Amino acid sequence: MTRQEVLDGLKEVIAVLRPATDLSEVNFDTELVRELGIDSLSMIMLSLATEEKFQMRFPDGEAAPTTVGEVCDAVLKALA
């Protein structure tokens, strides 16, 4: 799976969690909190939905991602 494929899948997750988001503006550098309005509860929901979407688990104790690209990288790392 490529980083772009993960981004495309993550956009599907974001579309459900944040339906008002213009997905054409979401890229690897998009900031989760400042640009998407992801708060702590939304971050948990994003993590759970991403794990379900990609059939993987994020490791415990990892620093919380701050950008969409960091989420993509964490997914790829977990799938490796």
Positions of the model-derived regions?
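Phosphopantetheine-dependent thiolation modules in NRPS/PKS and related acyl-activating systems
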Residues: 1-34, 52-80
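Phosphopantetheine-attachment site and its flanking helix in carrier
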Residues: 34-52
